[in-house]
C-alpha cells in the first residue's frame, strides 16, 4: 500500500503544474473572446468562428507531437539520455512539416466559413482574416510543444506552467495594442486577437528555448551536428506513435462541434443551457487530463527502467487518483450546479436546463476520468493505435448516434433535446472507459519481454 501512496505523490507533483498550464492556456482563449467582445459583438463572433476551426487543426498537430513524451521518458528511464537530443531534433522537423500543412488548411478555411448558412459577409470576412493572422502562430505553438514535451518527458512539468502564464500575461497588453491600434499599430479589432495570439506563441517558444538552454539538468542534452539531419525512420516512428493520438483528439473536438450544430436549431434556451454545461464540464476535465499526462511520463519512465511491475503500479495509481478526483468534482457539480449556472446566465429556463445537464455531466465524470487516464497509460506503453480505435468506436459509433436518436427522434422515447445528447456522452465515455481498462489489462498480462520490446521501439 505504501508504494501506491508514494506513487500518488509523484503523480500529483507532475500533474499539478500541468493543471495550471492548462488553465493559463484556456484563459488566453477567454481573454481573446472578452477583449474582442469589448470592441464589437461582430468581432467577438468572428473570433469564436475562427477558433472553432483553429482548434481541431492545431490539436491535430498537438496530438502528433505527444509521441515525444513517452519516447523521451523511456530513454530517460533506461539511462540513454544521449539519444534524447536526436529525438527532439526530429520532433522539430515533424512540427515544421505539420505546421505547413495546418497553415495551408487554415489559409483556405475561408471556403468553409463563406459556405456557412446565412452568415453575414462582414462577419465571414473578419473570421477569415482572424484565421489568416492566427495561422502564423502555428509553427511557434508546435515548436513550443516540442520543447514542452521534452521537459515533461524528463519529468519537468513546471516550465510548461511558467511559460503558459508568461503567455497569458503577454497576451493581454498585446491584444489591447492590436485590437485598438496603439503605439503606432493599426486598429484591427478581432483580427488583432489573431495577430496577438500568434505573437504570444512565438514568445512562449523562445522563452522555453532560453530556459532549456540554461537549465543545468539538461546540459547533457545537446544536439550533435549529425542529429540536425533529417532522420526519416525516427520521424516516421514518431508519426506512427502520434498519429492515432492526433486523430483521437480531432475526433473528440469535432464530436462536440457536431453536437453543437445539431442542438442549434432547438432554440436559444437549449443552446445556452447546453453550452453552459459543456463549458463547465470542460473546466472539470482539466484535472483528469493533467493526471493522464503525468501517468504517461511515469509509465514510460518505469518501462525505460525495465520494470513492468512498477509501470503497472503507476498505471493503477493514476486510475485510482483519477477516480477519487472525479468523485470530488462530481459531488461539487451536483451540490453547486444551480449557483454555477447562475454565474453564466440568470434566465430561469436556461439555469434549469443547464443545472439538469450538469447533473448528467456529474454522472459521466468518473468514466471520463478513467478513459482519459487510461489513454495516458496506453501512450506510456506506446500502444496508441488502440486509443484511436477505442475513441472512434466510443464517440462516433456509440455516443453520437445514440445521442441523436434520444435527442432528436422518437424511435425510443419522445425527443429529449440536449439531454439526449448528454445521455449519448454518458454511453460513449463509459464505453471508452471499459475498453481502455480492458486494453490496459491485456497489455499488462503480456510477458515482460514483449512489453519492454514494444516500449523500446
UniProtKB/Swiss-Prot annotation:
Family indicated by similarity: Belongs to the multi antimicrobial extrusion (MATE) (TC 2.A.66.1) family. MdtK subfamily.
A single Pfam family, by name?
A: MatE
What's a GO biological-process term for it?
sodium ion transport
| Entry's Gene Ontology molecular function annotations | antiporter activity; xenobiotic transmembrane transporter activity
Subcellular localization, as worded in the UniProt entry = Cell inner membrane
Q: Which organism does this sequence originate in?
A: Cronobacter sakazakii (strain ATCC BAA-894)
The record's section on InterPro entries has: MATE_fam (IPR002528), MATE_MdtK (IPR050222), MdtK-like (IPR048279), Multidrug-R_MdtK (IPR022913)
Provide the transmembrane region boundaries. 11-31, 53-73, 93-113, 127-147, 160-180, 188-208, 243-263, 276-296, 316-336, 357-377, 387-407, 418-438
Q: What is this protein called?
A: Multidrug resistance protein MdtK
- Function, please? Multidrug efflux pump that functions probably as a Na(+)/drug antiporter.
Where does it primarily localize?
membrane
Instruction: Identify its membrane topology class.
Output: Multi-pass membrane protein
Any one Gene Ontology cellular component term annotated for this protein: plasma membrane
Question: Is Signal there in the keyword field?
Answer: no
- Mind listing the UniProt keywords for this protein, alphabetically? Antiport, Cell inner membrane, Cell membrane, Ion transport, Membrane, Sodium, Sodium transport, Transmembrane, Transmembrane helix, Transport
Amino acid at each position: 500500500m505504501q508504494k501506491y501512496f508514494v506513487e500518488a505523490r509523484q503523480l500529483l507533483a507532475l500533474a499539478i503544474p500541468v493543471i495550471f498550464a492548462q488553465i493559463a492556456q484556456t484563459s488566453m482563449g477567454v481573454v481573446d473572446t472578452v477583449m474582442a467582445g469589448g470592441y464589437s459583438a461582430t468581432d467577438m463572433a468572428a473570433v469564436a468562428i475562427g477558433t472553432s476551426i483553429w482548434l481541431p487543426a492545431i490539436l491535430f498537430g498537438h496530438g502528433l507531437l505527444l509521441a515525444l513524451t513517452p519516447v523521451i521518458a523511456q530513454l530517460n528511464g533506461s539511462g540513454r539520455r544521449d539519444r534524447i537530443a536526436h529525438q527532439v531534433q526530429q520532433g522539430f522537423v515533424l512540427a515544421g512539416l505539420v505546421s505547413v500543412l495546418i497553415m495551408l488548411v487554415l489559409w483556405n478555411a475561408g471556403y468553409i466559413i463563406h459556405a456557412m448558412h446565412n452568415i453575414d459577409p462582414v462577419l465571414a470576412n473578419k473570421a477569415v482574416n482572424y484565421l489568416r493572422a492566427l495561422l502564423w502562430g502555428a509553427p511557434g505553438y508546435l515548436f513550443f510543444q516540442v520543447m514542452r514535451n521534452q521537459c515533461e518527458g524528463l519529468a519537468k512539468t513546471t516550465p510548461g506552467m511558467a511559460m503558459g502564464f508568461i503567455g497569458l500575461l503577454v497576451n493581454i497588453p498585446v491584444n489591447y495594442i492590436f485590437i485598438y491600434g496603439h503605439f503606432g499599430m493599426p486598429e484591427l479589432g478581432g483580427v488583432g486577437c489573431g495577430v496577438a495570439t500568434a505573437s504570444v506563441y512565438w514568445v512562449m517558444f523562445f522563452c522555453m528555448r532560453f530556459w532549456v538552454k540554461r537549465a543545468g539538468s539538461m546540459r547533457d542534452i545537446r544536439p550533435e551536428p549529425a542529429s540536425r539531419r533529417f532522420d526519416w525512420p525516427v520521424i516516421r516512428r514518431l508519426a506512427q506513435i502520434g498519429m492515432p493520438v492526433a486523430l483521437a483528439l480531432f475526433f473528440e473536438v469535432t464530436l462536440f462541434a457536431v453536437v453543437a450544430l445539431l442542438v442549434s436549431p432547438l432554440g436559444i434556451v437549449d443552446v445556452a443551457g447546453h453550452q453552459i454545461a459543456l463549458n463547465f464540464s470542460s473546466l472539470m476535465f482539466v484535472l483528469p487530463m493533467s493526471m493522464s499526462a503525468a501517468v504517461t511520463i511515469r509509465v514510460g519512465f518505469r518501462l525505460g527502467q525495465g520494470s513492468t511491475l512498477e509501470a503497472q503500479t503507476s498505471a493503477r495509481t493514476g486510475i485510482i487518483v483519477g477516480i477519487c478526483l472525479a468523485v470530488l468534482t462530481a459531488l461539487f457539480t451536483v451540490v453547486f450546479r444551480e449557483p454555477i449556472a447562475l454565474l453564466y446566465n440568470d434566465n430561469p429556463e436556461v439555469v434549469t436546463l443547464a443545472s439538469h445537464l450538469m447533473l448528467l455531466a456529474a454522472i459521466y465524470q468518473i468514466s471520463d476520468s478513467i478513459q482519459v487516464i487510461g489513454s495516458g497509460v496506453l501512450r506510456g506503453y506506446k500502444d496508441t493505435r488502440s486509443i484511436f480505435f477505442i475513441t472512434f468506436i466510443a464517440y462516433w459509433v456509440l455516443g453520437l448516434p445514440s445521442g441523436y436518436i434520444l435527442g432528436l427522434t422518437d424511435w425510443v422515447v419522445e425527443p429529449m433535446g440536449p439531454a439526449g445528447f448528454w445521455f449519448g456522452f454518458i454511453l460513449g465515455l463509459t464505453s471508452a472507459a471499459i475498453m481502455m481498462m480492458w486494453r490496459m489489462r491485456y497489455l499488462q498480462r503480456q510477458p515482460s519481454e514483449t512489453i519492454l520490446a514494444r516500449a523500446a521501439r
